[in-house]
């Protein structure tokens, strides 16, 4: 089949997974996106990937964040046209769709990039069995009769031997207000579908504060520095809400 010169031909096997990843990540760097596509089995050639991204940028389905520096490569986000195209291919979410007034704010860039880095670290180590993004979780919570109590940053399935283990993941880059933590404590107490919540933090000061905020929550909680987790993964030494430390491997057993 021949196409008109300059027309954009969308590949359901290559373009749609890429657009879906950009949407679900909220923000993703060029390097991260290539690795996510490669590990997902969608694109193994960097030249092919670069060409694909350029097409989607030129067509306005993906946008580049011009004012973001320090990410190591260009940072992308989905556009309204990109969301509309995803919906045309059956990829709808209840919380980020073509009628959504505001797209994710630039203030969330480095939060999103860190979550991408965590996902990639688990994937490279062949530990990742499943990853549901905040977009997917929030969409599920909107329409489900049995929602999770919180829109977690991710719900993660990992392999421990031949067994799958699930936990909720939260990344705390900056501290929230006392009122927000009060609501979060109530949500964690009420959660029945998730047995363990792993809080990764941007530094030890945030970690210590979180342990203090959540020490009364009757839930299996673990706290760790995000950079340490990316290095050690299941061998990361985590702190419980009671201040006792253990390897994450043992906490998840």
Where are these regions (language model features)?
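A short, highly charged nucleic-acid-interacting micro-segment common to nuclease
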Residues: 99-116
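Hydrophobic, Leu/Ile/Phe/Ala-enriched alpha-helical segments that form helix-helix packing faces
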Residues: 37, 53, 57, 86, ...
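Structural motif
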Residues: 26, 60, 126, 192-195
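Non-catalytic C-terminal interaction segments of nucleic acid-processing enzymes
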Residues: 3, 16-19, 175-183, 190-253
């Amino acid at each position: 089949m021949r196409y008109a010169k300059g027309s954009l031909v969308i590949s359901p096997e290559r373009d749609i997974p890429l657009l879906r990843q950009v949407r679900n990540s909220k923000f993703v760097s060029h390097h991260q996106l290539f690795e996510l596509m490669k590990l997902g089995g969608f694109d193994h050639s960097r030249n092919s990937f670069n060409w694909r991204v350029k097409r989607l940028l030129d067509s306005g389905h993906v946008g580049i964040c011009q004012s973001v520096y320090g990410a190591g490569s260009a940072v992308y986000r989905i556009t309204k046209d990109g969301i509309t195209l995803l919906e045309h291919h059956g990829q709808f979410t209840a919380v980020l769709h073509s009628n959504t007034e505001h797209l994710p704010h630039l203030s969330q860039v480095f939060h999103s990039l860190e979550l991408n880095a965590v996902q990639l670290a688990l994937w490279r180590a062949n530990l990742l069995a499943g990853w549901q993004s905040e977009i997917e979780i929030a969409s599920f919570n909107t329409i489900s009769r049995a929602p999770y109590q919180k829109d977690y940053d991710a719900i993660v399935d990992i392999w421990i031997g031949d067994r799958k283990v699930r936990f909720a993941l939260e990344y705390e880059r900056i501290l929230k207000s006392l009122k927000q933590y009060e609501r979060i404590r109530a949500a964690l107490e009420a959660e029945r579908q998730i047995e363990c919540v792993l809080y990764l933090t941007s530094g030890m000061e945030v970690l210590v504060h979180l342990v203090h905020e959540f020490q009364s929550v009757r839930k299996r909680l673990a706290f760790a520095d995000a950079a340490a987790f990316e290095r050690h993964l299941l061998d990361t030494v985590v702190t419980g809400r009671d201040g006792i430390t253990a390897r994450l491997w043992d906490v998840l057993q």
